[in-house]
Amino acid sequence: MTNIRKTHPLLKIVNNAFIDLPAPSNISSWWNFGSLLGICLVLQILTGLFLAMHYTADTTTAFSSVTHICRDVNYGWIIRYMHANGASMFFICLFMHVGRGLYYGSYTYMETWNIGVILLFATMATAFMGYVLPWGQMSFWGATVITNLLSAIPYIGTNLVEWIWGGFSVDKATLTRFFAFHFIFPFIIAALAMVHLLFLHETGSNNPTGISSDADKIPFHPYYTIKDILGALLLILVLMTLVLFSPDLLGDPDNYTPANPLNTPPHIKPEWYFLFAYAILRSIPNKLGGVLALVLSILVLVLMPLLHTSKQRSMMFRPISQCLFWILVADLLTLTWIGGQPVEHPYIIIGQLASIMYFLLILVLMPMASTIENNLLKW
């Protein structure tokens, strides 16, 4: 008799996705981040659910309710800090996952890649709305500054911003709707992630060489299940080290001051994982131009399959492209640093140069390098 896992309508899906799935025999630890992102999402949904049980989405009590969670709720402090730092781990895994995709040419799986870009946008939107909920100074002013960017849209901008605010400023209506959206979005992300996986399993995983691995497949279980468990343990180790030893390391001290519309903090800045985009936004003196650059900095990922001029899929055997890739990584780190600095000399010019470099590398230099490498292969 056939094993139940191969015949049962539900178990069959799990079996084909996580047990008997044919996987390339040579995928490295860079392929661990997909499962780690899944773990991060489940962790965020669970901790978020328990936080929502004690949180109140009202301007008068939101800040106090978060304090109450940390002081009076059983293990509330650890749930709160796991949720806050879990977001950081989520974005570290996201950036690594996208970086892996860029390096090894995984973007040639167009459907999987484009859903991934939508997932990235959805996760960024969720994290932004979540940051508003504690209703500290940085929550309030971050919400004000970022939502205000939509007013740069010609003709409908102002109406759009007031519609999102639910009034003429960030207030109770804004907080309530942000809480509602912050609660529902992770479930939308989970659904999209399943579609992401569905499309991936249509083609099978890419591998470091970028060459078809159909001739050499191994079952996902036990090989990659055990590998994913190791990755998960390392993720939890890093997360819990952060939570238990320095939970506020990545946060902003300003968010421990209750929101005050009459007092603007000296330096308004988002969480660290948005700083690179924030630096690109600030490097353009024009409001609409800045907003466009901000959106394009992520949307440029959609163009990656079109910008792929190389005859090889992966960068494994392309040293020039490798150099440019790591320069891009360094550039993104520079932008992240600049995003957290005040708007003054020399930071302004460094930010502008790094922003130009970012788009230049992706849109011009990397496709050029690929063409040069193609020609070098003819010799």
Swiss-Prot record:
* Residue stretches spanning the membrane: 33-53, 77-98, 113-133, 178-198, 226-246, 288-308, 320-340, 347-367
The residues listed in the UniProt record as binding a ubiquinone, with positions renumbered to this chain, are H201
Co-factor binding details = Binds 2 heme b groups non-covalently.
Task: Please give a single GO biological process term from the UniProt record.
Answer: mitochondrial electron transport, ubiquinol to cytochrome c
The protein's required cofactors: heme b
User: Which topology term describes how it sits in the membrane?
Assistant: Multi-pass membrane protein
> What miscellaneous comment appears in this entry?
Heme 1 (or BL or b562) is low-potential and absorbs at about 562 nm, and heme 2 (or BH or b566) is high-potential and absorbs at about 566 nm.
**Biological role:** Component of the ubiquinol-cytochrome c reductase complex (complex III or cytochrome b-c1 complex) that is part of the mitochondrial respiratory chain. The b-c1 complex mediates electron transfer from ubiquinol to cytochrome c. Contributes to the generation of a proton gradient across the mitochondrial membrane that is then used for ATP synthesis.
Its recorded name reads: Cytochrome b
**Protein species of origin:** Cephalophorus rubidus (Ruwenzori duiker)
